[in-house]
């Protein structure tokens, strides 16, 4: 019984020390492709946090600046604003999608075309206020139609 007890203690201690990033799952990550000379695009995904957390930033090697944004309608005018912290409620999936929350890639270093993969590093603030990172590979899809993102920046 002593051996079993020790094993359980080791398992519990290991589970308690699992990094917070292991509690955040990212699915269906994609980036909208760009056309020649385009300097911005959006990244979209589904984020689920088991314990509850906040998305507080992001980085990518393909862009000079990366920000979390929210797009909304205000009196028939599309508005975009930077979001310093996006809540990730425990056990709920937050969808970053066109026309809503998204990760904005600004000052692109190269065009992004269908079939490319874009590395993203999401910065997650945990309940204890520590910040961890989640590495994501987002597939590039076809470029936006002319009506999408028009006049947003």
State the predicted function of each range:
Residues 1-11:
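Bacterial N-terminal signal peptides that target proteins for export
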Residues 14-15:
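Repetitive helical segments and hydrophobic/amphipathic motifs
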Residues 18-22:
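Sec/Tat signal peptide C-region and signal peptidase I cleavage site
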Residues 23-153:
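Compact, glycine-rich, soluble single-domain proteins
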């Amino acid at each position: 019984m002593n051996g079993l007890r020790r094993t359980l203690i080791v398992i519990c201690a290991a589970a308690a020390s699992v990094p917070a990033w292991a509690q955040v799952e990212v699915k269906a990550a994609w980036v909208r492709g760009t056309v020649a000379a385009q300097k911005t695009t959006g990244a979209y995904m589904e984020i689920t946090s088991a314990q509850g957390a906040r998305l507080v930033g992001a980085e990518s090697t393909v862009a000079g600046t990366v920000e979390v944004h929210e797009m909304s309608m205000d009196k028939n005018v599309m508005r975009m604003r930077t979001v310093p912290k996006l809540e990730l409620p425990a056990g709920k999936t937050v969808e970053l999608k066109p026309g809503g929350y998204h990760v904005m890639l600004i000052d692109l270093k190269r065009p992004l075309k269908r079939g490319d993969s874009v590395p993203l590093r999401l910065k997650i603030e945990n309940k204890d206020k520590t910040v961890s990172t989640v590495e994501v590979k987002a597939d590039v899809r076809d470029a936006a139609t002319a009506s999408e993102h028009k006049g947003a920046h």
